[in-house]
Amino acid sequence: MHYFDHSATTPLHPKVKKLMGEVGDFHFGNPSSVHAFGQKAKIVIETARGQMAKAVGCNSNEIFFTSGGTEANNLVLWNLIHQNKKHVVTSVIEHPAVLKVLDNLEEFGVSYTAVGVDKNGGVNPNEVQNAITADTGLISIMLANNEMGTIQPIREISSIAKEQGIFLHSDAVQALGKIPINAKDLGVDYMSFSAHKFYGPKGVGALYIRKGLKLQPLIIGGSQERRVRAGTENTPGIAGCGLAAELAVNSIQDTHTHLESLAKAFKEEIKRISPDIIFNGHPKKNLPGLVNVSFPGYRSDLLMIYLDREGIAVSSGSACSSGDIKPSRILSEMEINDEINICSLRISFGTGNTLEDVDYLTTCFKSTLERIRSSA
């Protein structure tokens, strides 16, 4: 099997898997308990909190563990119902864990403006500024898009937010471990993360909350996570999240170089095989190792079926159901026409991929394109 869908999820790092097993075996106490078993588990959690904080450039007391990026986003957004200013500026390419939440919040008096993107999937800070109203209390723009990888100008947007006295949230789920992140330098007030995107476990993530800010809990009960997120902590998962973040950031330069070399090799060879292909996303301000490519005349659902038969996992932003295929929402917002849109695939390389994997991938692409052509 050949896995090229690391933007969807990543395999557990072996060291993370080992640590989680050890924590489950030897640190199983309830972290809220005062006895030694509980206190040992609490130390594990606080160690992970420190690792996570160091990875994203903040203080330990600014990191709050959640069940993942979706919960972290929800925690920030649902707090709007407690705020006086209930208008949000966001973008049309945000994850459903932002846009669908905002849709649901409308019945609670929250409104939002979703600014568009350019042909490369980039948000224009000037459009963000123009969308601000007297009632705007939050700006929520992702750090990097999950489908085509474009990195957004968060620092510039942060300057606008600060000038206007507006809080800034950024969904950074796709970015950690791929590009350097420093919450202080970026100037954000809230930032969401998910461990399974950086070789950590599923079902655990984190939210950065700038010191001095307070959020009302979504999940109410005990006093865990300093009363921001009730419920007995997932100690093995949190330990895995912390170590995965540490490992990802410590090797970020090597990872960046490796992923870029794989993407470069793939682009060069696939362009030679099929000269009329189109690469989507920003040519430079892009996550390393993520390639969104359109194959005009070849539907993405057919491409994925043929590639899957060869043991290759890639993905598509297009929704396939009962033989019908709907264009990718993200690519449509970039004004890519439907004919090209439904022929687009996302290839996202990971640290375990090799140049030999790229050779196999491009060889299978070549045979797949030939097979589809001959059967047309």
Name every feature range the model reports, one short phrase each:
Residues M1-A376:
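Pyridoxal 5′-phosphate
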